[in-house]
């Protein structure tokens, strides 16, 4: 069994650790309102030498991008639409998840200091 671990490094980096590789995602503000720039780096345990190995990692890289663009982002947009559907509603997010609470406290603190 393989485990995928997602680690958020405040404020804008996400590490996704797989059995044989690590993805490093950087999320930065774009030049316009509501624009974001995202970069992805993929690091493998072993250097890809053969054409087959290079194709394998190129395919993994493209798969990661496709999943984020075609699945994760649309899902996130739909969730946000739901949040805005009833702005008077109280929302409890991560009540029993200290990691999420700490992350949001860190964001709030950084915004106060900025």
Q: What is each of the regions a protein language model found here?
A:
Residues 1-114:
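C-terminal catalytic domain of Rieske-type non-heme iron oxygenases
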């Amino acid at each position: 069994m393989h485990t995928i671990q997602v680690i958020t490094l405040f404020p804008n980096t996400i590490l996704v650790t797989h059995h044989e590789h690590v993805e490093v995602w950087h999320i930065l503000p774009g030049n316009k309102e509501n624009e974001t720039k995202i970069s992805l780096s993929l690091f493998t345990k072993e250097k890809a030498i053969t054409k087959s190995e290079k194709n394998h990692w190129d395919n993994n890289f493209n798969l990661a991008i496709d999943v984020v663009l075609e699945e994760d982002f649309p899902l996130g947009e739909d969730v946000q639409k739901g949040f805005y559907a009833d702005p008077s509603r109280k929302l409890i997010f991560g009540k029993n998840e200290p990691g999420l609470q700490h992350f949001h406290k860190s964001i709030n603190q950084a915004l106060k200091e900025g």
